[in-house]
């Protein structure tokens, strides 16, 4: 509980408003409970100021909005406060409400187009093996291991984030491995949460429907590395923008690099890819050791090196580091094999960018010897410019390609596929099966038991989103159903 004046210590309020006791903060008028303060933020998709009356009807006892027409008047039963820059300040307000929980933990923020989920997942496993209690914030949820709560976003809204940080702190977390999206950085979702370690995985085309161009996309990512409190930066030195990020670091920030370059702090001395995973020799700070893990793809080796860099940069010895990396487990829906005797191997992966798809296809080639099938679609109401690029990557990288649906949302699935086809050199080179379940079924039937099928785009997701409705659909379940229909051994 907190008064309105305590929430807004730098705002002059009438006594009747200042003493209003709040029981919670809410951004969504539909979720307002009696006693809450409603923060009517003007967002990208909707404007909270249009729902003030609904929030008050639901029991809101105060309303904050960026609106000059708002003023606190003595006679108002529900104080309405004009708060300039509210959208940029929600994180600060939420952190104040929850007691700034991030300040009591070591927060590691990971940004980049691809790899955020895997790096944070691997880091949590490794830190837990070292005796820490590390919480996860990202695509797969917010929480300690096996107690994640799905938030619906890579980086949740500021109130959900601070509430989650408070929850994991109370549960004993000492470290947080957080995915930090470009949207979150641009929208100030982290608020004042101190990030002590900033990590960069890579940069390739994505989210240009939001950022407009790659320069703005990079600028949003760069914000993570210029935040106050960053003590360690861990950067993929193989990416062309790496040294741009190094150049923006403040004096005194230690920089650890990982990649294939000779001068990298963390690099791979040798690697062998098998149908069971990856065997690699890593060199970390001049010392070498071997790791064998059930991980697929060179990009996962890069993710592994990022984690090694984070731990090395925080003083973990090589011996302890080797043991911690050995405890890493595969990420659900990230190069996840689904197998059944007598059937082709299906690899379920979240790849939904041209670069991510290309790397997933390359991984399948490296680990498996049979023909390579690729089932791919593109999400509706998202960056349309990458659709032909995704198609071109699939055509170039696979032996057989099937275009299908992938969360069409409000768009016509066939229209999305038609736009993908613009990137093909031969439109007759692909098969089009709009229904995703049928695409999986038919492809499993067509492939041989020594072949591999990359089922890309949805990964861990357990739904297909059509016109605002999320229908149950899990690619792993679709693969098992296709195996059973084919008659593979149980």
Curated annotation (Swiss-Prot):
UDP-N-acetyl-alpha-D-muramoyl-L-alanyl-D-glutamate binds at residues 27, 29, 154-155, 181, 187, 189. This is UDP-N-acetylmuramoyl-L-alanyl-D-glutamate--2,6-diaminopimelate ligase. Belongs to the MurCDEF family. MurE subfamily. Catalyzes the addition of meso-diaminopimelic acid to the nucleotide precursor UDP-N-acetylmuramoyl-L-alanyl-D-glutamate (UMAG) in the biosynthesis of bacterial cell-wall peptidoglycan. Its EC number is 6.3.2.13. Keywords: ATP-binding, Cell cycle, Cell division, Cell shape, Cell wall biogenesis/degradation, Cytoplasm, Ligase, Magnesium, Nucleotide-binding, Peptidoglycan synthesis. It is an enzyme of class 6 (ligase). A motif (Meso-diaminopimelate recognition motif) lies at residues 406-409. Its cofactor is Mg(2+). Pathway: Cell wall biogenesis; peptidoglycan biosynthesis. PANTHER family: MUR LIGASE FAMILY MEMBER, UDP-N-ACETYLMURAMOYL-L-ALANYL-D-GLUTAMATE--2,6-DIAMINOPIMELATE LIGASE MURE HOMOLOG, CHLOROPLASTIC. HAMAP family: MurE (MF_00208). Carboxylation is probably crucial for Mg(2+) binding and, consequently, for the gamma-phosphate positioning of ATP. It catalyses: UDP-N-acetyl-alpha-D-muramoyl-L-alanyl-D-glutamate + meso-2,6-diaminopimelate + ATP = UDP-N-acetyl-alpha-D-muramoyl-L-alanyl-gamma-D-glutamyl-meso-2,6-diaminopimelate + ADP + phosphate + H(+). The modification N6-carboxylysine is found at residue 221. It comes from the Bacteria. The keyword Transferase does not apply. One of its GO terms (biological process) is peptidoglycan biosynthetic process. GO terms for molecular function: ATP binding; magnesium ion binding; UDP-N-acetylmuramoylalanyl-D-glutamate-2,6-diaminopimelate ligase activity. GO terms for cellular component: cytoplasm. Gene3D superfamilies: Mur ligase, C-terminal domain (3.90.190.20), Mur-like, catalytic domain (3.40.1190.10), MurE/MurF, N-terminal domain (3.40.1390.10). ATP binds at residues 112-118. Meso-2,6-diaminopimelate binds at residues 382, 406-409, 457, 461. InterPro entries: Mur-like_cat_sf, Mur_ligase_C, Mur_ligase_C_dom_sf, Mur_ligase_cen, Mur_ligase_N, MurE/MurF_N, UDP-N-AcMur-Glu-dNH2Pim_ligase. It is found in: Cytoplasm. It comes from Alcanivorax borkumensis (strain ATCC 700651 / DSM 11573 / NCIMB 13689 / SK2).
């Amino acid at each position: 509980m907190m008064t309105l004046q305590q929430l807004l210590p730098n705002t002059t309020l009438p006594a009747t408003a200042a003493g209003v006791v709040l029981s919670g903060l809410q951004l969504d008028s539909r979720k307002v409970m009696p006693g809450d303060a409603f923060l009517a933020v003007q967002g990208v998709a909707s404007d909270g100021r249009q729902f003030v009356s609904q929030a008050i009807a639901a029991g809101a006892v105060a309303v904050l909005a960026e609106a000059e027409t708002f003023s606190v008047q003595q006679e108002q039963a529900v104080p309405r406060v004009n708060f300039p820059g509210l959208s940029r300040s929600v994180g600060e307000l939420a952190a104040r409400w929850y007691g700034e929980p991030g300040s009591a933990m070591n927060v590691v923020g990971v940004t980049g187009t691809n790899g955020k989920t895997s790096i944070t997942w691997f880091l949590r496993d490794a830190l837990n093996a070292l005796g820490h209690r590390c919480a996860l914030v990202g695509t797969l949820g917010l929480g300690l291991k096996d107690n994640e709560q799905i938030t619906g976003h890579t980086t949740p809204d500021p109130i959900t984030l601070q509430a989650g940080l408070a929850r994991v702190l109370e549960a004993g977390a000492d470290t947080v491995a957080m995915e930090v999206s470009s949207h979150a950085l641009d929208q100030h979702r982290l608020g004042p949460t101190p990030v002590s370690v900033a990590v960069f995985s890579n940069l390739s085309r994505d989210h240009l429907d939001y950022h407009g161009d790659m320069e703005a996309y990079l600028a949003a990512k760069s914000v993570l590395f210029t935040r106050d409190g960053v003590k360690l930066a861990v950067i993929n030195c193989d990416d062309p923008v790496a040294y741009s990020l190094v150049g923006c670091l403040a004096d005194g920030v230690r920089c650890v690099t990982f990649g294939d370059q000779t001068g990298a702090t963390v690099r791979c001395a040798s690697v062998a890819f098998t149908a069971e995973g990856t065997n690699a020799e890593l060199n970390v700070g001049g010392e070498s050791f071997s790791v064998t893990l059930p991980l697929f793809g060179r990009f996962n080796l890069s993710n592994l090196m990022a984690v090694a860099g984070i731990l090395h940069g925080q003083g973990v010895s090589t011996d302890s580091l080797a043991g911690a990396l050995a405890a890493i487990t595969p990420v659900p829906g990230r190069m996840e094999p689904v197998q059944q005797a007598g059937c082709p191997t299906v690899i379920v992966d979240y790849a939904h960018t041209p670069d991510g798809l290309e790397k997933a296809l390359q991984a399948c080639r490296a680990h498996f010897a049979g023909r390579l099938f690729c089932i791919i679609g593109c999400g509706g109401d998202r960056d349309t410019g990458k659709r032909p690029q995704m198609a071109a990557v699939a055509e170039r990288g696979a032996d057989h390609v099937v275009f299908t649906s992938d969360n069409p949302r409000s768009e016509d699935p066939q229209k999305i596929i038609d736009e993908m086809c613009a990137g093909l050199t031969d439109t007759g080179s692909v098969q089009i099966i709009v229904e995703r379940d049928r695409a999986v079924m038919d492809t499993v039937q067509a492939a041989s038991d020594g072949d591999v099928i990359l089922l890309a785009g949805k990964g861990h997701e357990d739904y297909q989103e059509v016109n605002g409705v999320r229908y149950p659909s899990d690619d792993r379940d679709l693969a098992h159903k296709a195996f059973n229909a084919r008659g593979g051994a149980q």
